[in-house]
């Protein structure tokens, strides 16, 4: 039996969360075409390969920090590297290699990561010659354990990736019952809060999504009614953002709740009731106490 902790690392909006969802063939983490969607170091176990358990860590994209929340996000990436047995450095072939990619490799070097697989994603969008050139140029910058070219939407390519991971992690030497204790799951409450944030990210433009956090005030299931009740607060950092989130006549907050109920109906086989509030915590992204209160803890 093999076991390993595997971090997926790369610059913002490179497709780390999408890759993880494609591995699990369902949505286990939120994803968006906007950068900095992932805020937490999310660890979740995959055990669908024979004689192997992989604890994947989806990390925030490494980027130049603009506030204390950004510093926290970068610290999450570095914390994941400390505990990882293998790192996947994800590169999007449809984008140029830039300073953010360089910074990721620098961090990997600084942490003496010696078991790193370069994963070149979106190979379907490039010619063989272009892929070869990208592979050669990036491989000169770091001593990778292996290099893979994939299309993360391809089940065959994902299978190749999983088997490669299995090759590069160690045998588990403990008792099988102890291995069960090492498995990780995303809690329902955390997943719902992230789902709400994803809906908001995809519903608004510019800075508003990045100044939003979600607090689940109540989440309970009443078996006799087959009813799941979710009460939550949308936290914004400026008074001017509150009416934008609410919308004219409550139109936007209504849209958010309708989308949430529709998404949850695909997951939970029950009736769903949601109630939401919009609250202001001024400049919370620069307030360490509020950052912790909102669930972003090291």
UniProtKB/Swiss-Prot annotation:
Organism whose genome encodes this protein: Malacoplasma penetrans (strain HF-2)
Record-given protein name: GTPase Era
Lineage, broadest ranks: Bacteria, Bacillati, Mycoplasmatota, Mycoplasmoidales, Mycoplasmoidaceae
Region spans: G3: 58-61
MF terms (GO), sorted A to Z: GTP binding; GTPase activity; ribosomal small subunit binding; small ribosomal subunit rRNA binding
Function: An essential GTPase that binds both GDP and GTP, with rapid nucleotide exchange. Plays a role in 16S rRNA processing and 30S ribosomal subunit biogenesis and possibly also in cell cycle regulation and energy metabolism.
InterPro entries recorded: G_ERA_dom, GTP-bd, GTPase_Era-like, KH_dom-like_a/b, KH_dom_type_2, KH_sf_prok-type, P-loop_NTPase, Small_GTP-bd
Limits of the Era-type G domain: 2-171
Residue ranges of the region described as G4: 121-124
């Amino acid at each position: 039996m093999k076991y390993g902790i595997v971090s997926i690392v790369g610059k913002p909006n490179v497709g780390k969360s999408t890759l993880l969802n494609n591995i699990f063939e369902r949505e286990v983490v939120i994803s968006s075409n906007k950068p900095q969607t992932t805020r937490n170091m999310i660890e979740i176990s995959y055990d669908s390969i024979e004689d192997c358990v992989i604890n994947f860590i989806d990390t925030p994209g490494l980027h130049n920090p603009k506030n204390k929340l950004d510093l926290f996000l970068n610290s999450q990436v570095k914390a994941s590297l400390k505990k990882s047995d293998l790192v996947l450095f994800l590169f999007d072939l449809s984008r140029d290699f830039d300073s953010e990619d360089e910074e990721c490799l620098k961090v990997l070097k600084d942490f003496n990561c010696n078991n790193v697989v370069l994963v070149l994603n979106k190979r379907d969008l490039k010619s063989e010659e272009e892929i070869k050139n990208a592979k050669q140029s990036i491989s000169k910058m770091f001593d990778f354990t292996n290099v893979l070219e994939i299309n993360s939407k391809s089940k065959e390519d994902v299978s190749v990736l999983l088997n490669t991971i299995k090759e590069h992690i160690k045998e588990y030497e403990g008792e099988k019952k102890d291995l069960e204790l090492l498995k990780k799951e995303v809690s329902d409450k955390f997943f719902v809060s992230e789902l709400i944030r994803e809906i908001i990210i995809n519903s608004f433009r510019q800075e508003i999504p990045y100044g939003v956090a979600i607090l689940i005030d109540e989440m309970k299931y009443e078996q006799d009614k087959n009813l799941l009740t979710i009460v939550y607060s949308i936290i914004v950092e400026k008074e001017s953002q509150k009416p934008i989130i609410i919308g004219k006549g409550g139109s936007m907050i209504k849209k958010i709740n309708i989308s949430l109920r529709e998404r949850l109906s695909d997951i939970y086989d029950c009736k769903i009731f949601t109630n939401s509030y919009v609250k202001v915590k001024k400049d919370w992204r620069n307030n360490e106490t509020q950052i912790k209160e909102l669930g972003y803890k090291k």
